[in-house]
């Protein structure tokens, strides 16, 4: 039976040791970040010299190196990012994993043959998104961690030529990647900029905002670690071409252990003998690091069991219970034996409120073993209560085995050396001439003394090869020597041969430096040209252009209820964006249509806001609303392109992550009639984004609570341990207004949307009134207010912003009417706080 083709196994590395660990244990490719522009800004990075070594180590073993360039790039950073990528390409990387759409386009212009992969931060989770990736010309995309096997099969069938990659192991972001703004909101450490503060790993209280009642408490949005070993066969059959292990910040021992485990599982897939792994087979993968394991969402939502709940960090493996304490020894019953130097934790029974304890095991005695249960006595420094759970946080033997697996790998890897070719010519009485070439470089050197008749050893190929081959620590290695042009029976002192070699190397190095400087200058000019020429063919929105012609500052109010839409219209909004998907239940289509007609009579446009996440199963509900034929606002880049191609008026929302003008140009090229830049940009950065269009076609969010996270998981469902998506009475009747309260007392509203996803909103509304003059001065003419929480003062805030915009348009100031409404319960957002 022929072997089945299996996906590439992609391992993480944050250090050279981790690169060695990965390739030694069977990784087909390794992804790592260099010191700039990647999504791990706190230590999991290689220097450029280390990156070159990583490429050498990997390539010697037949593995590839992928560079993570997976953050959003600010306007001023684009030239630096492209130049830095060039330096990394020079070091030998095979591909780059990129998030920023504008950067992808620039890479294709500057490095047209280079391989580009789309990061999971691009939030590709359906056919429409995958089609845009194919249109962009990328080679592969990393799918959202939330995709099911059914989703993947549908994407594979619809876009057969796009490479697909998916995560199989490691830490899980609770939010859809690319859609987490919560860290940046709280601490200015943006997940989209590589500085995530891990807001999801904090403990929270879930409260009913109406009654104040506590509904749940703990690490409520801290996901367990992914371990998709049971699904490997099905993932491969679904058409995934690459399986990715998360963990660039993990230790080399983790990389070695997990890579080896999945390499062995994939060998079974290849042979056609795969069966779900046993406890013994997966135990090392869980033991090396685990917050608890989940199979992820390949089979659908898991509900309460998806979350760690009790602790956010490495827990290890639960082995058994404490049965006694005698003469300084803890007595335990465990289902796997404990050894000396193992790290142990002891936890109170479920529901207990005492703190856990732990220590490294001292002397261990096995008292008995029967039916897979070991009774052991462990020397301890203090008593541990009977009935407490025994957890092994680290296993000494496993760590030693992992270290041994890569101890000798890549230690001799040397810097890449360029092959030299030497052609020698000479006759009696004339100097020896050597033409030395290295790639496109060529030098000619001559001896300072003439060739003479040999009285002892004559000059021959072996001697020439020996002397010209002594290249030591130079960046060259002798590959070929041709001495056919040297007459026989001649002599030249060895010191003269050495001088010629040294002179050739010195001249080659000078030429190489000149060539490198010239290449860098050429590359720099190419980069400058590419960055300066922003998609000249990109169209601007005709409706927005018309607005600009009147010089009116247009006010857009985004709401989720019909009554709020009508309040905004009455208070002076020029356009209303309705998000009927934000919360259960939907408004009726007939009621929305009637409101739309009333708005039209008042000269107000009604625009439909789509969800950013539209899984295949959700599409039927969305299509019902799209049938209304309204203009659309969408943060789903795939939908922007699909609807624009069908002739719809579509504005790209902030979830499209427009961080620079080149991304804006690509969104316009996809058909967007307008673009809302990221809510993580400062006023000055927004000005840079909109400058090529003079502000025309752009809309800025100036008030309200942006969505901080989009979760496939539902915290309310988990609190009551209901079957996922079968509990709408909780969010529609029992607890329609809930908040997550963090340890500092900040409350984050939770909106449970049409597909039972949670959208976590910022704890306080942004107020950008003081920045209106500068934004208007940049040419921006559309300003959006977000009203997405019960109790929002829609009419008052809309009226205050109408007054502020009219004041700015008249050359005055925006006034303080909005601040008077808010008091001190607001934030200036990122208008003056860079991420």
Predicted regions and their residues:
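Active-site glycine-rich loop that binds ribose-phosphate moieties when present
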Residues: 124-126, 227-228
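Glycine-rich, highly charged phosphate/nucleotide-binding loops
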Residues: 46-52
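Short glycine-biased active-site loop of nucleotidyltransferases that positions the nucleotide triphosphate
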Residues: 108
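Conserved phosphotransfer cores of two-component systems
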Residues: 111
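Surface-exposed amphipathic alpha-helical tracts and adjacent flexible/coil segments at the periphery
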Residues: 1-24, 29-40, 55, 61-71, ...
């Amino acid at each position: 039976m022929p072997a089945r083709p299996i996906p590439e196994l992609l391992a993480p590395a944050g250090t050279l040791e981790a690169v060695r660990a990965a390739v030694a244990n069977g990784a087909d490719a390794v992804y790592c970040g260099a010191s700039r522009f990647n999504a791990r800004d706190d230590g999991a990075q290689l220097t450029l010299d280390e990156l070159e070594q990583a490429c050498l180590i990997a390539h010697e073993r037949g593995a590839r190196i992928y560079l993570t360039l997976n953050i959003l790039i600010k306007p001023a950073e684009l030239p630096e990012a492209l130049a830095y990528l060039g330096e990394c390409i020079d070091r030998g990387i095979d591909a780059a994993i990129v998030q920023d759409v504008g950067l992808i386009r620039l890479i294709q212009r500057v490095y047209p043959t280079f391989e580009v992969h789309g990061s999971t931060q691009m939030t590709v989770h359906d056919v429409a998104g995958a089609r845009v990736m194919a249109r962009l010309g990328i080679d592969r995309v990393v799918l959202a961690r939330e995709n099911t096997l059914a989703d993947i099969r549908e994407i594979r069938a619809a876009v057969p030529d796009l490479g697909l990659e998916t995560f199989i192991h490691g830490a899980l972001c609770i939010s859809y990647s690319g859609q987490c703004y919560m860290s940046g909101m709280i601490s200015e450490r943006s997940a989209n900029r590589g500085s995530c503060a891990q807001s999801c790993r904090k403990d929270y209280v879930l409260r009913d905002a109406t009654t104040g009642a506590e509904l749940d408490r703990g690490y409520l949005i801290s996901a367990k670690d992914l371990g998709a070993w049971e699904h490997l066969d099905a993932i491969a059959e679904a058409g995934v071409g690459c399986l990715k292990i998360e963990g660039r910040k993990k230790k080399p021992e983790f990389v070695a252990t997990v890579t080896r485990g999945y390499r062995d599982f994939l060998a079974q897939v290849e042979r056609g003998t795969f069966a779900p792994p046993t406890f013994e087979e997966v135990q090392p993968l869980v033991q090396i690091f685990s917050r608890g394991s989940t199979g992820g969402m390949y089979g659908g939502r898991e509900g309460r069991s998806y979350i760690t709940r009790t602790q956010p960090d490495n827990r290890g493996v639960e082995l058994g219970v404490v049965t006694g304490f005698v003469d300084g020894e803890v007595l335990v019953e465990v289902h796997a034996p404990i050894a000396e130097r193992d790290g142990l934790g002891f936890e109170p029974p479920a529901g207990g409120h005492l703190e856990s304890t732990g220590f490294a095991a001292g002397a261990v005695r096995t008292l008995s073993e029967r039916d897979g249960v070991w009774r052991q006595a462990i020397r301890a420094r203090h008593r541990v209560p009977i009935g407490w759970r025994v957890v092994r946080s680290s296993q000494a033997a496993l760590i030693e085995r992992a270290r041994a697996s890569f101890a000798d790998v890549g230690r001799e890897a040397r810097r890449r050396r360029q092959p030299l070719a030497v052609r020698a010519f000479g006759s009696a009485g004339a100097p020896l001439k050597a033409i030395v070439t290295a790639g496109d470089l060529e030098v000619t050197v001559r001896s300072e003394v003439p060739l003479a008749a040999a009285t002892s050893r004559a000059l021959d190929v072996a001697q020439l090869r020996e002397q010209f081959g002594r290249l030591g620590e130079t960046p060259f290695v002798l590959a070929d020597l041709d001495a056919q042009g040297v007459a026989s029976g001649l002599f030249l002192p060895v010191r003269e041969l050495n001088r010629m070699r040294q002179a050739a190397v010195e001249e080659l190095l000078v030429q190489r430096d000149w060539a490198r400087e010239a290449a860098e200058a050429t590359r720099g000019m190419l980069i400058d040209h590419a960055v300066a020429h922003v998609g000249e063919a990109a169209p601007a929105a005709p409706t927005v252009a018309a607005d600009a012609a009147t010089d009116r500052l247009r006010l857009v109010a985004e709401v989720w209820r019909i009554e709020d839409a009508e309040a905004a219209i009455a208070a002076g909004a020029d356009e209303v964006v309705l998000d009927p998907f934000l919360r259960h239940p939907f408004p009726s289509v007939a009621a929305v249509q009637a409101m739309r007609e009333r708005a039209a009579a008042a000269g107000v446009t009604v625009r439909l806001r789509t969800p950013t996440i539209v899984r295949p199963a959700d599409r039927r509900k969305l299509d019902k609303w799209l049938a209304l034929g309204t203009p659309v606002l969408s943060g789903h880049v795939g939908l922007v392109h699909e609807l624009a191609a069908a002739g719809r008026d579509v504005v790209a929302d902030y979830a499209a992550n427009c961080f620079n003008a080149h991304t804006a140009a690509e969104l316009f090229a996809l058909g967007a009639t307008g673009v809302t830049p990221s809510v993580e940009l400062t006023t000055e950065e927004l000005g840079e984004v909109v400058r090529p269009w003079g502000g025309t076609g752009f809309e800025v969010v100036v008030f309200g609570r942006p969505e901080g996270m989009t979760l496939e998981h539902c915290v309310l469902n988990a609190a009551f341990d209901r079957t996922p998506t079968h509990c709408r009475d909780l969010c529609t009747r029992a607890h329609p207004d809930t908040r997550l309260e963090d340890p500092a007392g900040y409350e984050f509203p939770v909106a449970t949307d049409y597909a039972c996803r949670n959208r976590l909103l910022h704890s306080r509304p942004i107020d950008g009134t003081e920045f209106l003059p500068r934004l208007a001065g940049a040419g921006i003419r559309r300003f959006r207010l977000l009203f997405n929480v019960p109790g929002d003062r829609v009419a008052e805030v809309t009226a205050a912003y109408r007054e502020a915009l009219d004041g700015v348009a008249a050359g005055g100031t925006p006034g303080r009417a909005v601040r008077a409404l808010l008091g001190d319960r607001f934030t200036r957002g990122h208008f003056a706080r860079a991420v």
